[in-house]
Amino acid sequence: MYSEWRSLHLVIQSDQGHTSVLHSYPESVGREVANAVVRPLGQALGTSSVAGSESLLKTDKEVKWTMEVICYGLTLPLDGETVKYCVDVYTDWIMALVLPKDSIPLPIIKEPNLYVQSILKHLQNLFVPRQEQGSSQIRLCLQVLRAIQKLARESSIMARETWEVLLLFLLQINDILLAPPTVQGGIAENLAEKLIGVLFEVWLLACTRCFPTPPYWKTAKEMVANWRHHPAVVEQWSKVICALTSRLLRFTYGPSFPPFKVPDEDANLIPPEMDNECIAQTWFRFLHMLSNPVDLSNPAVISSTPKFQEQFLNVSGMPQELSQYPCLKHLPQIFFRAMRGISCLVDAFLGISRPRSDSAPPTPVNRLSMPQSAAVNTTPPHNRRHRAVTVNKATMKTSTVTTAHTSKVQHQASSTSPLSSPNQTSSEPRPLPAPRRPKVNSILNLFGSWLFDAAFVHCKLHNGINRDNSMTASFIQILLSYKSSIATQASMEFRRKGSQMSTDTMVSNPVFDASEFPDNYEAGRAEACGTLCRIFCSKKTGEEILPAYLSSVILNSPPLFCCDLKGIDVVVPYFISALETILPDRELSKFKSYVNPTELRRSSINILLSLLPLPHHFGTVRSEVVLEGKFSNDDSSSYDKPITFLSLKLRLVNILIGALQTETDPNNTQMILGAMLNIVQDSALLEAIGCQMEMGGGENNLKSHSRTNSGISSASGGSTEPTTPDSERPAQALLRDYGSTDSAAGLLIRSIHLVTQRLNSQWRQDMSISLAALELLSGLAKVKVMVDSGDRKRAISSVCSYIVYQCSRPAPLHSRDLHSMIVAAFQCLCVWLTEHPDMLDEKDCLKEVLEIVELGISGSKSKNSEQEVKYKGDKEPNPASMRVKDAAEATLTCIMQLLGAFPSPSGPASPCSLVNETTLIKYSRLPTINKHSFRYFVLDNSVILAMLEQPLGNEQNDFFPSVTVLVRGMSGRLAWAQQLCLLPRGAKANQKLFVPEPRPVPKNDVGFKYSVKHRPFPEEVDKIPFVKADLSIPDLHEIVTEELEERHEKLRSGMAQQIAYEMHLEQQSEGELQKRSFPDPVTDCKPPPPAQEFQTARLFLSHFGFLSLEALKEPANSRLPPHLIALDSTIPGFFDDIGYLDLLPCRPFDTVFIFYMKPGQKTNQEILKNVESSRNVQPHFLEFLLSLGWSVDVGKHPGWTGHVSTSWSINSCDDGEGSEPDEITSSEDVGASIFNGQKKVLYYADALTEIAFVVPSPVESLTDSLESNISDQDSDSNMDLMPGILKQPPLTLELVPNHTDSLNSSQRLSPSSRMKKLPQGRPVPPLGPETRVSVVWVERYDDIENFPLSDLMTEISTGVETTANSSTSLRSTTLEKEVPVIFIHPLNTGLFRIKIQGATGKFNMVIPLVDGMIVSRRALGFLVRQTVINICRRKRLESDSYSPPHVRRKQKITDIVNKYRNKQLEPEFYTALFQEVGLKNCSS
């Protein structure tokens, strides 16, 4: 209003009219001169009034010299009569402008205006506070003020310059006394009412006789803003503005308009001679003289004035707290009084007020305020931050709201309000608004910005516009009253007696304790809300309220349906109508000039999010018609009939779909996408229940359902046409009729079609929307609803098309963010394939998916429509990036290894085999097997084969060659027990191997045996006669001598013995031959016996073709090793690295820590103790926990447990010994603390991720002996195949646990203790980035900002933060803000309100849960789990250092190859294959 005018502050500061020449002399000189000069004048003044003597001063020089002395005398202490004489003299002399007297010097009578101006400046010195004699100063100040009043009222010759000096004098003395913080019992507190009263009265007189120029109005407005911590300022302002309004209404609306009567005392403040034009100008300027009255609710603004700042530092230089100033404790009452004054003005313009008997402004009788209990029982939030509000006074149509955070002030809820009286019943009819009342828009133009801002006092704001949920029930009247008729208004009034409260009563009231005063502004808020209600209720038929105000209602009411307000559901149909007007409108042209269309749509979407669960939750419960269709434009509107909540579902769904089609803002779009998954999943769960139950019942049963905590009854799943009140129909029938339009399958199909179409058109350029759309598609894939395969194929095909488009974008557009979108698309594709593996049974779908995988790995497709087929071997790999290639490889692994194979018989906790070298060694039957009995080979630099050639001695057939292979690849550790199968399995037991067919026994009967003496010559030789020649040869005896005869005899004897011996041997041989069986095993021909010892590793590699010379050669022009290499397991550290590799998970793992927070709790110990007993928590909390995952034993669990010290272990406890503690636990009420990670955790896993849900609880400290035992057990362990953090007893091949755990259940360490006990220097894999999410169940929503997350950081340790390269100092400052928190607040309706903190990052918000959403009991667990998965996936996408699990494993395999490769020549390699392993190390 006065922006182009200059304030008079500089003029006032530079004016030295209040100083005297005596100020230049020593203080003793001035005091003596003043005492000597002023005493005769004062005494003469006392006698002159009786004797009529003239003044001692005759000339102008004498008067001016004397005035210099009096000016100094007014600054003296009040211990003497000097100051009193000075005041007496000056109050007598200023009457020269009223009625000249003889006691007044003649020069003053001649030029009264000039001298009075100087006197007024001198009198400022009197009002400077003194340290003592406060009562004397008050008496003298009142004497001056009464003289000023008389001067202004009665003077008729006062010039404009004198009026201006008089106004500046009053402004200055008010500023001197009222601007600083009030001192209790001080002069300012006693004079405040009189000071401000005189100022306003004189100002009104000046308006009549000499209207102040704009600089004076601007100066007055600025100075009054510094005095508002005095109740009298607002009180006097309220009186003046009401008196002016009473006069204004007389000539503005004529005599027929209901008069606005004010007390005569207040009416007399307005000079009778003030004309109508002057009244109007003065009224508008006085209305804004108080500045923005909403500032009165903010102590930070009130205490930011210069005088406050001067005293803001104490003597030690330390700033004081705001609560140190008692005057600020009055602000709630002052704020209420200001709002009440504005309320009276509104009532006056509406013509619905009646006069009051006291001096306060009138009390409106048409108060549509809530009963006192409604305002009192609403607990205000703790630690609310103050809010500074700035209003554009030029237009008065919109307000710019900014937030200023100051120190938090604790408070407690008060049971009574000192500003409100008990409820009273009006005994007379409530008057209707005047027929000639102004339009609603006109009143809102004047007071709207103040009232709307006052209605949100101490309500936290987000992004400057979106209000949080801290509104009390009072503001809800704005909306209730807007659609309510006056005839149906409640008869209870909420009357406040604020004006009748004395200052002493207010100060002594305990409600104004220093720690509570900022939160007692509800009375002023309620007054503003009630005023807005009356404004909206006075809308005439056919009158249109400006979009600026209607949009403000929508803009400021997103949490309206989240606050457990009784009866708020009455306005649901009307809000739906408003949303149908706003959200489908793409342009919102009629609202653009008043609000930001994006913010308006965002608020509308927030309201929609809170309305979506209502149809399913309340079902066919009818909404009672209390509005009677009074505000419907159509007389035949369905609003006149009872409607069911379920009948609103189709309208809400259509609004949701329409909003998505017209929305362009990324944040708003993501909120809608989150809502879509909410409604689809809720519908699917409801229909699943409805199909299982056939429930009949009357309306009473349905109504009772809506009031109970079940929330999952099939009755709420029914459907009824809006005009058919079939509330007694069974759920199945209702679902059947309603399913044709918005069943779960229909919603799923509509969602898939709309999202996939926009994903590949409008959204593919926007990263945040694309990620949210892909997350929605991933969530829709998990919805258990039967839909046609064509719709599922559409989703898969759209994701593939999205990947093709992103990969084909020009190279300059490729960035990390773009590749993150492609990676997210591959992850979405994996979700669809694992949830619907049968989709790959279709040839075209399989082809499309594999082409996308090929595109991701190689950078191009082998077959394009316009090109010839290019074989993969001929292509040069050129992927979009290594991250894209890694994502495509993970998809290929998912297709080849997980589809149809998950979960495995070992359970979903581990997709890997639960055996390792330690297990195989322990349960093989050969004592010679040890860790060196394994042969280690590497295939293609990516797969490590650990081969055990000795048979395990179990169900394997020992006759056949067998080999046990531990395959460690990118996808995990797999164990294969293989045998060379040479015969059909059924033939092994029935055939005798290697035994020839039996032959008949030979016949030994060969006939008669004849004894024939064989002759050397035939018998005919003896018959031949001798000739003479024959006789020439002598006989032997003739020529044998005696010597020869002896020799001959020896020879004959020897020959006889030999013949006898040979005969004996022949007979013996014949006897043995007769005794020998047939066939002779010595001479019989039979097949060779089977081999008993095999080098099965060599056979295995050879049979698979790995032992070719080409496989052993180094590739040309490449740094890669050969296709097959051997590893040397004797090198120190080999088995540690193998165990390190086994520690690397093959799936992403996430951790969720769940807390329960009862009302008023602020410390971590209080919160942790809540879960120790089920009696301390709500039953829904335990149900919610079990909906997140299933319970697993930490000691037996092979998956992620929430801490690295117990995760991914293939060891277990003995069933017999482990069951006893479980039985003891089940007999005790341990509540949710059983899932604190010591014995059990809640666990969820699918093919792509695993989550551990931990409920931290207090843990007693361990004794020193226990700590030493733990260290001893670690050091004594002989399982050196794994790193120390996983040295626990092994598991058998049959998965039969037979060993006790290393620690008893009572001795287990809490997560925080484990973090501290983890030994330094032990290898911990690089598992980051750490993905932790906290879920907090809060019974009271206002306690959210009190949640001690920083104190609980030690309880949400996973051990990942202990990895190398992590700085302790860095963790302490970054961990808290890196942990997203999901707050869940149960509403009285059985629904749940969601609050998200810290889940926004580089990629904006995460769905499906968004801030402010309302969720049903059915869908809560699913949505929380899905949100956690998406949050952690987003976090991994954001991280520059994150590598997928298969990449980390591949890198570790490469590292192992480089460190332990056995660099042998081909002959040496082949030679080693034929050598035995392990025998030389049997003793090791």
From Swiss-Prot:
What's this protein's name?
Ral GTPase-activating protein subunit beta
Spell out the residue ranges making up region: Disordered: 355-437, 699-728, 1297-1325
The UniProt regions of compositional bias labelled Polar residues, in chain numbering, are: 369-381, 392-428, 701-725
Q: Assembly and partners?
A: Component of the heterodimeric RalGAP1 complex with RALGAPA1 and of the heterodimeric RalGAP2 complex with RALGAPA2. Heterodimerization is required for activity.
Q: Which residues carry this modification: Phosphoserine?
A: S359, S421, S710, S1275
UniProt GO cellular component terms = cytosol
- Has UniProt tagged this entry with the keyword Glycoprotein? no
- Xref: InterPro entries: RALGAPB, Rap/Ran-GAP_sf, Rap/Ran_GAP_dom, RGPA/RALGAPB_N
Enumerate the Gene Ontology biological process terms: activation of GTPase activity; Ral protein signal transduction; regulation of exocyst localization; regulation of protein localization; regulation of small GTPase mediated signal transduction
Q: Where is the composition biased (Low complexity)?
A: 1302-1313
Functional note: Non-catalytic subunit of the heterodimeric RalGAP1 and RalGAP2 complexes which act as GTPase activators for the Ras-like small GTPases RALA and RALB.
* One MF annotation (Gene Ontology) recorded for this entry: GTPase activator activity
Q: Which UniProt keywords apply?
A: GTPase activation, Phosphoprotein
Gene name for this UniProt entry: Ralgapb
User: Which parts of the sequence carry Phosphothreonine?
Assistant: T363, T379, T724
